[in-house]
Amino acid sequence: MQIKRWFLNNSLRNYQYLLYDKSHAIVIDPLKSDIFAEFIAKNKLQLEAILITHKHGDHIAGVKKLLAIYPNAKVYAYTGNDLFKPDIYVKDGSFINLGFTSFRVMYIPGHIDDHVCFLFEQERALFCGDTLFNAGVGGVQAESADINQLYDSLVKITKLDGDIKPYPAHDYWLGNLDFALSILADDSYFNYYRNQVAELAAEDKPIVNLAEEAKLNIFIRAMSDKALLKALPDYSLGREMFVKLRQLKNNF
């Protein structure tokens, strides 16, 4: 299947994603229903599934309107919410075969306690919501957030094949790289990508695979990068370094 990406240019800098082939469509975390409905109608597709990574409003606001247009579409989510009840409740390890494609579910709490991601192995795509961003990770402001769970979820993602491409729900490239450079100012990867994305519109920013993400993401590098021991000598690599970096990012 092909993957269509839109940038909403709203205050939260949301990306929206749709998978499609000649006949079928799958929507991920719809905030704005109209862009999906227009594309689906224009290409004469059938909306088969709506996948929800978590229940924050900017990931579910468009679900009811899409279901009004496509009542046969099935909603997949870890838990329900005030706007809708899922047709299929997923959990860690769930495998869903839709016939025209399939996906696996990973439970990745930390940003919020109902967070999952959807791994499309044939497409080599991971829809990771607000857990992993380009050059960053999700925040821990939600009531059910847990910074240690977020670390464990990130470790879980890094164990996937390096050629899989993560598709995060927001464009936070610049802010995340600026933070990373405040810790490791001379790092070649941080500087390279900061210079590259600075001139690009959000719609044109790169979609990198997990192997590349591991080089440009300071939170992944917190697991093993000894350069961080010089920058933050009071903290050990792994969970302790990750927690410290997430705390510093909160106030950046």
Swiss-Prot record:
GO terms for biological process: methylglyoxal catabolic process to D-lactate via S-lactoyl-glutathione. Thiolesterase that catalyzes the hydrolysis of S-D-lactoyl-glutathione to form glutathione and D-lactic acid. Its EC number is 3.1.2.6. SMART domains: Lactamase_B. Keywords: Hydrolase, Metal-binding, Zinc. Belongs to the metallo-beta-lactamase superfamily. Glyoxalase II family. It is an enzyme of class 3 (hydrolase). Transmembrane segments: none annotated. This is Hydroxyacylglutathione hydrolase. The gene is gloB. It comes from Francisella tularensis subsp. holarctica (strain LVS). The lineage of its organism: Bacteria, Pseudomonadati, Pseudomonadota, Gammaproteobacteria, Thiotrichales.
